[in-house]
Design a protein with these regions (language model features):
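Conserved phosphotransfer microenvironments
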Residues: 52-73
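C-terminal output helix
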Residues: 108-117
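Short hydrophobic/Thr-rich beta-strand motif most characteristic of the beta2 strand and flanking loop
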Residues: 28-37
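His-Asp phosphorelay/catalytic-motif detector in bacterial-type signaling
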Residues: 52, 76-81
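The C-terminal output helix
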Residues: 118-129
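Acidic, metal-coordinating helix/loop segments flanking the phosphotransfer/catalytic sites
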Residues: 36-53
Length: 129
């Protein structure tokens, strides 16, 4: 299953990759992680239908994951579900505005990320399935 990870920060992308591992739970397919650092790269991938699930860093620069999530939900047909990583727990209401399907906060809790991502992976068949 293709999991796209969006953040300008290579350390955040590495933390997400480590939290996901080969698969975030035993009952979901293996994750093929695709890292992107820019909003244009993310939208090229989404336009091509190359993602099953998105993990978006709300603190990404210059395009934050919240705005990117909302834009994707508005513009991409059959947009993949999105897990949004917000700057603090109190920003959960912004995740609602952005139409994220799941939310966790920084600092990244690997167990919480894996749990939320596995839930999204269970809900959506893989591209090409």
């Amino acid at each position: 299953m293709k999991v796209v990870v969006y953040s300008h920060d290579a350390d955040v992308r590495a933390q997400v990759r480590l939290a996901i591992g080969r698969r975030p739970a035993m009952d979901v397919p293996e994750a093929e992680i695709i890292e992107v650092a820019t909003q244009p790269a993310l939208f090229r991938l989404l336009d091509a239908g190359g993602a099953d699930v998105m993990v978006l860093d709300g603190e990404a620069q210059p395009y934050g994951g919240m705005g990117v999530c909302r834009q994707a939900k508005d513009e991409i047909y059959n947009c993949p579900p999105a897990l949004l990583i917000v700057g603090r727990a109190d920003d959960g209401w912004l995740a609602t505005w952005s139409r994220a399907d799941a939310v966790i906060s920084h600092p990244i809790d690997p167990v919480a990320l894996a749990h939320e991502l596995a839930g999204l992976m269970r809900e959506r068949p893989a591209v090409g399935s």
